[in-house]
Regions:
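Outer-membrane beta-barrel translocator/pore domains, especially the C-terminal barrels
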Residues: 1-210, 214-233
Length: 233
């Protein structure tokens, strides 16, 4: 269930919407143990009936997903809703009881899950920011952080992303960058790289060239991957 609330600000030419959401769910029976499977709860699957995304598994028992979605849009000259400027969505799963058969990485094995959310800020037509996060039920620690930004020009695009997983979700931290350059109407040059911040080492470099016309698309790519082995010094 969801209930939308709206407000128009004609002076500042903006439109605000707030939508509380609720999913009440009950499934009888038992489930097989999948505690060792790597899964993660996010706002994208918060209101899904099958949050663990296993075809033969349904989480048993009574649970409630609660959250909200807030959006701010521009109003155009005719006061119709236009481009989105900012959005924030977050929520949590509350279960009747714990279930240790569910992967701890999802946090829905506990009665109160992590608070998960996503946010986007379109600064202008060229630059935007995205943020996905997970906060523990005590509101003290961020267990998951994913920040990304895209910068677009007429003949060039740049992107930067940062990801961190901690505690029950995982143990990762890396930075990934990419760029695309339009050389002319039919050719592009691309580059991206990923760096592991826990080991202070590069994981890969990609360099690509693409040729595109009305009936043909061809490309050349060079990829170099790196690895570490504790037995090799």
């Amino acid at each position: 269930a969801k209930l939308g609330m709206y407000k128009e600000d004609l002076i500042n030419k903006s439109f605000h919407s707030l939508t509380p959401k609720l999913l009440l769910r009950y499934a009888p029976g038992q489930m097989r143990n999948i505690e060792s499977v790597s899964k993660r709860l996010s706002y994208a699957n918060l209101f899904s009936l099958n949050k663990v995304d296993e075809l033969d598994v349904v989480e048993p028992g009574l649970s409630t997903s609660i959250g909200f979605e807030y959006k701010k849009n521009k109003l155009n000259d005719s006061n119709d809703v236009g481009e989105e400027v900012f959005s924030l969505s977050l929520g949590q799963v509350v279960s009747e009881k714990e279930n240790m058969d569910i992967p701890s990485s999802t946090s829905i094995d506990q009665r109160f899950s992590d608070i998960v959310g996503t946010s986007k800020y379109n600064i202008n037509e060229k630059l935007n920011l995205n943020y996905n996060f997970s906060i523990d039920q005590s509101y003290k620690n961020f267990n998951y952080n994913e920040v990304g930004t895209d910068l677009k020009f007429e003949k060039a695009k740049f992107n930067l992303s940062y990801l961190q997983e901690k505690n029950h979700i995982g143990n990762k931290e890396y930075l990934q960058t990419g760029a695309e350059f339009k050389l002319n109407n039919s050719s592009e040059l691309g580059f991206n790289t990923k760096r592991n911040l826990l080991t202070s080492s590069a994981e890969f470099y990609n360099l690509s060239y693409s040729y595109i016309n009305d009936c043909l698309k061809a490309g050349i790519a060079y990829r170099r991957e790196f690895y570490t082995d504790r037995d090799i010094e």
